[in-house]
């Protein structure tokens, strides 16, 4: 058979859903947790995020190089998809198991909290990079038919968009509702909000891992290629920099940085300004903000493959 089965397609899309659940929890929930639950300093959050992005920037080409060189009998991508979900879950959960910064009484304790937050977040980013690169590369190996490959990637983008929008809308209100419940039981708002956030985010992380894990076991790679020639990481980076398309992608990522920062800030603004940190309903404001953005992503994800087939990928994405 030259292409994937319906079962493989379903498992792959469920895995994409699970992976984006995990990513959404970290992207939305962890920022809120750092800022509004354990009260890390803004400078510390910025530094941790910067270091994590640098680690991911170096990790991406390294993982691609490892996948190209792979000669494993399970396939180039499946090995990473089998072994990456559990470390991703462990590091993502560790990100939420930290003491409030304001509860530390000594500088050593405060430094320990910052180190724990930074190491767990950077560890998550590195582990997630292995799973992410393998997951998005897998459709190229699951089928020999270009039309089927493009269709699967388009469906994956739609699933990722739906999941991202859903987790953004649900995560903070659910965490704050659970936090208010625990706060009333313990008469301690800080402890209650921390417990509520850990419970809700941990549940989503566990569900995402359950959906993500089967992809490596239940899919098949049909495209085979000889291992790529061995080159160092720096040789690969130099080769990529000589490619005009790579420089365009890098520039595009830099230009999108402000919008990414806005996405991180908007949930905090909505939660505090409109929702009084969970004490006032504010979901309708989130819907007003999120629905247009979600529809735009959905339309773009569905239209991009068709435009690429008609006009060429270089023209469409230039």
Task: Locate each region found by the language model.
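Membrane-embedded alpha-helical bundles of multi-pass transporters/translocases
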Residues: 1-318
């Amino acid at each position: 058979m030259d292409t994937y089965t319906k079962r493989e397609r379903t498992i792959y899309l469920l895995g994409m859903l699970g992976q984006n659940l995990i990513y959404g929890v970290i992207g939305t929930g962890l920022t809120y947790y750092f800022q509004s639950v354990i009260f890390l300093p803004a400078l510390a959050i910025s530094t941790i995020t910067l270091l994590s992005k640098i680690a991911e920037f170096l990790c991406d080409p390294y993982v691609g190089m490892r996948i190209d060189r792979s000669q494993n009998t399970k396939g180039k991508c499946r090995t990473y998809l089998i072994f990456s979900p559990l470390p991703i879950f462990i590091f993502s959960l560790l990100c939420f198991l930290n003491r409030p910064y304001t509860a530390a009484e000594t500088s050593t304790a405060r430094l320990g909290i910052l180190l724990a937050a930074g190491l767990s977040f950077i560890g998550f980013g590195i582990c997630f990079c292995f799973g992410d690169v393998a997951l998005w590369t897998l459709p190229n190996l699951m089928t020999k038919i270009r039309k089927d490959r493009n269709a699967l990637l388009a469906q994956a983008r739609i699933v990722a968009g739906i999941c991202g929008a859903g987790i953004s809308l649900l995560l903070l209100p659910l965490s704050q509702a659970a936090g208010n419940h625990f706060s009333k039981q313990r008469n301690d708002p800080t402890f209650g909000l921390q417990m509520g956030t850990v419970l809700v985010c941990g549940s989503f992380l566990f569900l995402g891992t359950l959906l993500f894990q089967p992809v490596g076991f239940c899919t098949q790679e049909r495209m085979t290629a000889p291992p790529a020639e061995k080159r160092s990481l720096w040789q690969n980076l130099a080769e990529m920099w000589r490619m005009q398309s790579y420089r365009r992608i890098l520039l595009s990522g830099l230009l999108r940085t402000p919008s990414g920062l806005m996405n991180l800030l908007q949930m905090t603004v909505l939660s505090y300004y409109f929702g009084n940190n969970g004490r006032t309903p504010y979901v309708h404001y989130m819907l007003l903000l999120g629905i247009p953005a979600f529809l735009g992503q959905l339309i773009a994800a569905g239209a991009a493959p068709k435009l690429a087939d008609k006009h060429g990928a270089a023209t469409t994405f230039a």
